[in-house]
């Protein structure tokens, strides 16, 4: 015959309740810990580990080939931007950056992807100084870049005398004016890291191309299994961000094509996120 035994109700309050809760969580985690994490679990042989790694690689490659629209987190870019802008309302403009992150699937030992993106709409304003004694190039540069410092020997003399302050971020020059820069303003530009040099790639006869690439260029490099790069600010228009995303896609694919490997990396799922917003999957194919 079964008998009913009354169990006294224990009420735990205050710090003890919190400790009890965390202790229960720990016990639950210990009881249901996967066998592979247990100290008594047998270690895998080299062949077993290799097969497991190969299986995971096949799974990641299969996932990379799935269309972005299959993800429950997918949104068209314009709709995703609306949500991300909403998440940044009230934040300082300096923190309202739209980031693009692309997962990279590759075999072990494959070199990480790297390169640079030239954005149609740069994320920040960069002031540039260009030095050349070629009058035709000076005229061309002054017409194309009126808001930047463009000049020859006269500009070098003004920097040397302190008439013009060194408030620019980058400097470029043609080979004909490099000796004057080295002899007159190297001690001024060098410590600030803006002295043009062949080693840095800031000296060229085609100075116009250097300026064009530098004004909107942003380097990227694969970290771990992903590439992350800023593609805009929340106050950019949808069109400006879309153009920057297209440029990033072209640069990523160029980096993949330039890989010297029989089995190059594959670009997988891509998400858009903001500084304080969620990650939203977009179509990056």
Curated annotation (Swiss-Prot):
Record keyword Transit peptide present: yes
Keyword S-adenosyl-L-methionine attached: no
A biological process term (GO) from this entry: mitochondrial translation
Annotated InterPro entries: Ribosomal_uL1, Ribosomal_uL1-like, Ribosomal_uL1/biogenesis, Ribosomal_uL1_3-a/b-sand, Ribosomal_uL1_CS, Ribosomal_uL1_mit
Gene3D superfamilies named among the record's database cross-references: 3.30.190.20, 3.40.50.790
CDD domains named among the record's database cross-references: Ribosomal_L1 (cd00403)
Superkingdom of this protein's organism: Eukaryota
Keyword terms: Mitochondrion, Ribonucleoprotein, Ribosomal protein, Transit peptide
Subcellular location: Mitochondrion
NCBIfam families hit by this protein: rplA_mito
Miscellaneous comment as given in the Swiss-Prot or TrEMBL entry: Present with 7000 molecules/cell in log phase SD medium.
Protein name per its UniProtKB record: Large ribosomal subunit protein uL1m
Organism: Saccharomyces cerevisiae (strain ATCC 204508 / S288c) (Baker's yeast)
Record lineage: Eukaryota, Fungi, Dikarya, Ascomycota, Saccharomycotina
């Amino acid at each position: 015959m079964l008998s009913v035994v009354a169990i006294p109700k224990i009420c735990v309050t205050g710090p003890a309740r919190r400790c009890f809760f965390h202790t229960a969580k720990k016990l639950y985690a210990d009881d249901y810990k996967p066998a592979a994490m247990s100290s008594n679990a047998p270690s895998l042989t080299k062949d077993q580990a290799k097969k497991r790694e190969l299986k995971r690689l096949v799974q990641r490659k299969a996932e990379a080939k799935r269309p972005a629209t299959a993800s429950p987190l997918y949104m068209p870019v314009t709709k995703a931007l609306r949500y991300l802008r909403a998440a940044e309302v009230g934040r300082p403009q300096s923190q309202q950056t739209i980031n693009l992150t692309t997962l990279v699937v590759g075999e072990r030992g494959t070199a990480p992807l790297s390169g640079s993106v030239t954005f149609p709409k740069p994320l920040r304003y960069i002031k540039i100084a260009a030095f050349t004694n070629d009058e035709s190039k000076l005229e061309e540069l002054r017409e194309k870049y009126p808001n930047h410092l463009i000049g020859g020997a006269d500009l070098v003399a003004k920097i040397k005398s302190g008439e013009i302050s060194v408030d620019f971020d980058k400097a470029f020059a043609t080979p004909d004016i490099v000796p004057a820069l080295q002899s007159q303003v190297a001690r001024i530009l060098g410590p600030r890291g803006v002295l043009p040099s062949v080693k840095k790639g800031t000296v060229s006869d085609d100075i116009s191309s250097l300026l064009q690439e530098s004004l909107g260029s942003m380097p990227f490099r694969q970290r771990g299994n992903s590439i992350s790069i800023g593609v805009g600010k929340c106050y950019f228009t949808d069109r400006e961000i879309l153009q920057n995303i297209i440029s990033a896609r072209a640069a990523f694919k160029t980096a993949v094509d330039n890989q010297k490997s029989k089995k190059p990396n594959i670009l997988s799922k891509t998400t858009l996120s903001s500084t304080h917003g969620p990650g939203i999957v977009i179509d990056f194919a």
